[in-house]
């Protein structure tokens, strides 16, 4: 039966036909991902199954509240999805309570702040310039505006976290919350040391494991538990799920406060299609293959860092224990912004990044940040990452010798090698 208000193609017309302009953008992005080497440390490549869940009818359902206690009817099936995500996450990380509703890592952090501290309270987090995250008290961020944010950094001599400084600042300022973790920390964090410092001053300890959660889940990195009172993470990055956030704890009291902070505190209806995709990703991470993946991510990062150092570049802290590294470009006399663009023209994607004690502006930088999660998902091993390291050195050396305007021949030659490498490891062949 036809109704005048009904769009005949609404339930049947493909995206390519219904919105060719947007479809062209998606097709272009698929081509970019297939044809370029992705080295942005915070990015990964999800499975076909994760994409199916995120693009499912779960997107239609509003579900304010929590499983079994919703403010809307018709939530039976989304309750199943959220419960699966929670139970799988608890199994993955060996913790008692999980909230999978945060829409992002930033909102997960905001949820912890809402739950455990008040505006004006003192927090102690890592400064952005040393590898911290905006949400750990950086001045432009809400966390830096609402709280008395004290910042710790790294040691000049080895760029490692300055635990003595953390302890001294904690004793001086008596923070309510200490935050461990960041966005550009290439070495494992001593959670036990942070716990001891927190206990000494009566602070709660939050670990932001957004970058390395997948390594924890895969047994390739120490867990923040039992040391952390609460942990936050994104669900993408090394965990290889959809873009989103999550909060984990072993404390029933903290869990109750976190649940109230997320809903109704800072969010309304959760994104049930994303939570369904989280459940899929967590199920994948419970498989034996994921343990092998996590171990390979670290091996690949170490191989890449080693090859870059052989090529005359410096690696901050002298290497990596994780999925990421900070490359100090100063030995070659080039800047991070120019290097990011030159590598991009050669189809190697990364991001400019400040290094500790960087003399350059954040828009320029003396370094780039590189990571191995996406390339490892694609199938690259240590041999491929050593080849990638040599290609990076080739572009950087060309940039140093020829300048930005004169490096086209080098970049084109490397782009051809990138194309050959990517062709050996195809992505999404059925899309």
UniProtKB/Swiss-Prot annotation:
**InterPro entries, per this entry?**
PyrdxlP-dep_Trfase (IPR015424), PyrdxlP-dep_Trfase_major (IPR015421), PyrdxlP-dep_Trfase_small (IPR015422), Ser_HO-MeTrfase (IPR001085), Ser_HO-MeTrfase-like (IPR049943), Ser_HO-MeTrfase_PLP_BS (IPR019798), SHMT-like_dom (IPR039429)
Q: Does the keyword Methyltransferase apply?
A: no
Q: Which reaction(s) are listed as its catalytic activity?
A: (6R)-5,10-methylene-5,6,7,8-tetrahydrofolate + glycine + H2O = (6S)-5,6,7,8-tetrahydrofolate + L-serine
Enzyme class, UniProt record, top EC level: transferase
What residues bind (6S)-5,6,7,8-tetrahydrofolate, as annotated? 128, 132-134, 253
Location of N6-(pyridoxal phosphate)lysine modifications: 237
Disulfide bridges in this chain: none
Which UniProt key words apply to this protein? Amino-acid biosynthesis, Cytoplasm, One-carbon metabolism, Pyridoxal phosphate, Transferase
Q: What does this protein do?
A: Catalyzes the reversible interconversion of serine and glycine with tetrahydrofolate (THF) serving as the one-carbon carrier. This reaction serves as the major source of one-carbon groups required for the biosynthesis of purines, thymidylate, methionine, and other important biomolecules. Also exhibits THF-independent aldolase activity toward beta-hydroxyamino acids, producing glycine and aldehydes, via a retro-aldol mechanism.
In Swiss-Prot or TrEMBL terms, this protein is called: Serine hydroxymethyltransferase
Q: What is the lineage of its organism?
A: Bacteria, Pseudomonadati, Pseudomonadota, Alphaproteobacteria, Rhodobacterales
